[in-house]
């Protein structure tokens, strides 16, 4: 089993930057804002054939109210999960009272702890680190995480007692069905994730946009593996002023591309707004399978529920293939019914059919409804084959098929959907016109032969006229 290493420290000491250096990614949002990382964030890492899991935590601050206190509780949870703790301090800021308080708590845990002094660049390291010996954790390991300096030496020290992997490929674990939960800020995404997981895993605070980063959470249900991706809420671009929110939008779009199925969460009480439609548009551009969850359905009047249903039917008419569920993430109503739709969408998105079967369906469709004519010549569709999955892509070859009008494309899409009962996924149809191998070639016959052909043609036409008389 992979060991778990937790990065612990007060806010803004550089834990997220160090996390990125260790995991070789930008998986944690990094900016010069105290308390930016608001939730535990897991990342797989490998160093010198040793695999481990890194947990990036929110800072343990001095505030005892609001979200800062809640984040402190999340950090304590990460400490309990960890096999090794990296206690990060700021060499530039020096030793603070909150560092000493954290050190006292860590010493009571009986776990292996490594003191790491970050931001040693630009300071006299030996002088700056003297005061940290007061913590009683030995000599601090020196790093400059923003530049990657000292990180390798730190990992060698931290991982010295961890055995090498017998086979690194065994650690490329199957993440199962990857499920991205997306939506505007404060529509209940994190509450839905917590309900699906059955634990208070993601910070769900009554503040818009409490989850700024995308969080990957592996779990199992009824013997099936999943990875839940809880994304930051996407705001309208006009309101995205802070660098943090810009990072979050990018992370949400990346999470969509990484997911197999996207669950779009909509607030029933606020109704469907343009940003909900834009978000669905992003998912369609990514070609992702989709399930719609209309959340906060509880405590609505019968009239409001009726109006909401009418609004859903009207505004979502461009995705008739998407399953729509009315749920209450807070109370769990309807949440369990999401899974069958998720599974059906996943299976539809990963359709695999032989070229022979697809071509037969194509022939039946064109026999029932002939393709239109283009410039006096009818479009001829010869054969079809799969071009990919998620979304299912069907490639059709023939003559002038690239001229196929939109309404006939929709007809073919509906035929394939009906035959294979495709639900919850867009279907992409591509057309490839067969090239004429002789196009552009000049005639190789000499003038004498060409003249003889012309005489034969003239004689044939005269004979044809006499026959008609």
Curated annotation (Swiss-Prot):
GTP 2 binds at residues 183-190, 230-234, 295-298. The keyword Repeat applies. GO terms for biological process: ribosome biogenesis. Residues 351-435 form the KH-like domain. Residues 3-166, 177-350 form the EngA-type G domain. Signal peptide: none annotated. HAMAP family: GTPase_Der (MF_00195). NCBIfam families: GTPase_EngA, small_GTP. This is GTPase Der. The gene is der.
